[in-house]
């Protein structure tokens, strides 16, 4: 019997597939639709200290090869999502969940995390160190000194399981430098990758999204090679206790298989979920199981990280 079960930081999931933060997770209704789908879990919209409207519309556009967006972290505020996942965790047959969050400053991040620390929520946290679409706010994880400082401060008081969502890295030296920092801390996971920041898509003679004069994060098919490279590079460098969530370019079972082959313990779906809805989890699960059965694999552990080299 082929199984898609997986585990992160002691939390078990019946299916390794879930949504990516930012997609189909703004409201309780959207999150419940994923909860009731074949997905193994959901991650909430990235919650900030206060609710945000985000960037002006239009701020998302589909393309033939994926998508471009400059959402600007629209969300209903951390209290909305924290209350919801806390309420859900006490229900019978509830799945384990991931609460995504970030402050618009290091001070705000600490305020939010201390709120979570003092709450009764006992699930996973995904700290977003990689949003490329908030004007005037750099992606923290590209500043290694700042990343080290923030993680040091967080783990001086935060005791619950926490992982981080990362931007894509493109230099081998950066993989080495980042992994050295991450291995210093009791991270539950890293998520590779957020969208590739500051792409530009043009229709005829005009940009397709309004914020930042058309500059936005690139997702979908286009970023899969970059996502796979990040997953595998960190799989080879991180302590085994730090699991990896693979995100980027997943629209079918083969894409999910490749992320796991590169070392991912869970796989998130973003652009394709936006286009297809929660029904995508049933299809991709079926396709992934068929691939595994054809290859004689019964579990994800049979092939996770077992990428062959020439």
Curated annotation (Swiss-Prot):
CDD domains given in the database record: DHOD_1A_like
GO cellular component: cytoplasm
Location of the active site: 131
Catalyzed chemical reaction(s): (S)-dihydroorotate + fumarate = orotate + succinate
Domain of life: Bacteria
Residues the record lists as binding substrate: 45, 69-73, 128, 194-195
Keywords: Cytoplasm, Flavoprotein, FMN, Oxidoreductase, Pyrimidine biosynthesis
Pathway of action: Pyrimidine metabolism; UMP biosynthesis via de novo pathway
Record's subcellular location: Cytoplasm
EC numbers, comma separated: 1.3.98.1
Binding annotation for FMN: 45-46, 128, 165, 193, 220, 248-249, 270-271
Cofactor(s) required, per the database record: FMN
Enzyme class: oxidoreductase
Cofactor note: Binds 1 FMN per subunit.
GO biological process: 'de novo' pyrimidine nucleobase biosynthetic process; 'de novo' UMP biosynthetic process
Gene Ontology terms, MF aspect: dihydroorotate dehydrogenase (fumarate) activity
Subunit composition and interactions: Homodimer.
Family recorded in the similarity comment: Belongs to the dihydroorotate dehydrogenase family. Type 1 subfamily.
Function field: Catalyzes the conversion of dihydroorotate to orotate with fumarate as the electron acceptor.
Protein name (database record): Putative dihydroorotate dehydrogenase A (fumarate)
